[in-house]
Amino acid sequence: MGNRAGAHFCLASGLRLPSKGGVTIGVIYVISDSLGETAEYVARAAASQFDGGGLDIRRVPYVTDLDHLEEVVNEAAQEQGIIAFTLVLPDLKKKLLELAAARGLEAVDLLGPLMDAITRVTGGRPRLEPGLIRRTDEDYFRKMEAIDFAVKYDNGKDIRGLSHADLVLIGVSRTSKTPVCMYLAHKRLRAANLALVPEVPLPGELLNLPPEKIIGLTIDAGLLYQIRQERLKTLGLPGPAGYATRERIEEELAYARRVMDQLGCPVIDVTNKAVEETAGKILQIYYRRERNGK
């Protein structure tokens, strides 16, 4: 992935300017409800004007809930850092300003004032959707690479890809592994996936992965039964088939749970969740771990 270099990739990226006597005298937390690249560029530009002190820039992407927000602000308070943010969701922005004020922190809204000015001049209303900006340079090619990766290593086509993935999704058949991987690819994460089948031994490539690279997907047995029945109808196959019986589904789900427990990976229940919702939870897990250096 890009942006792996930096003084503090524990928060997705970092820039450290020369410091006096090797001591960092300032930390800027860049908080965003999307990737946060826009805010980071502005923070870098501002930091570059201060040659006399060390400024450590820590980007925290995909902050989309209040618990995550409070966690980051508390960390910033421990460092007495500056907060620069591009949050377009009003509730999150309001809460951030309240938390920062309560802790005596400087919090700078990099996007809001300009959006307010555009509204005053044009009379238009902002869409208030995170991540609308689209980049067509290096990020575009990284996205294309991630999409190619997801296609090449879909459903265990080539087990060698597991060790090169940013994330590996595991679960029984019809738990949305493939569409979630494609969604993650559009966020420039190289995601592979592997179906868990009781009769198929787990590959060594999976067993050798660190748990933080693996995400387990599970689903309600009743819903999975309906999905598989519909799948058989779509394919024009007669039922019932072993693949779609309740007994088989219960067996597969129990096996998958044992595997996930063995691997020690986080598990997400995809029951009645849209692909975007599942992917959003995965992104939160991924970037929190990056921020914590795990």
UniProtKB/Swiss-Prot annotation:
It is an enzyme of class 2 (transferase). Keywords: Kinase, Nucleotide-binding, Serine/threonine-protein kinase, Transferase. Transmembrane segments: none annotated. Pfam families: Kinase-PPPase (PF03618). Its EC number is 2.7.11.32, 2.7.4.27. ADP binds at G171, V172, S173, R174, T175, S176, K177, T178. InterPro entries: Kinase-pyrophosphorylase (IPR005177), PPDK_reg (IPR026565). It catalyses: N(tele)-phospho-L-histidyl/L-threonyl-[pyruvate, phosphate dikinase] + ADP = N(tele)-phospho-L-histidyl/O-phospho-L-threonyl-[pyruvate, phosphate dikinase] + AMP + H(+); N(tele)-phospho-L-histidyl/O-phospho-L-threonyl-[pyruvate, phosphate dikinase] + phosphate + H(+) = N(tele)-phospho-L-histidyl/L-threonyl-[pyruvate, phosphate dikinase] + diphosphate. One of its GO terms (molecular function) is ADP binding. NCBIfam families: PRK05339.1. Belongs to the pyruvate, phosphate/water dikinase regulatory protein family. PDRP subfamily. Bifunctional serine/threonine kinase and phosphorylase involved in the regulation of the pyruvate, phosphate dikinase (PPDK) by catalyzing its phosphorylation/dephosphorylation. This is Putative pyruvate, phosphate dikinase regulatory protein. It comes from Moorella thermoacetica (strain ATCC 39073 / JCM 9320).
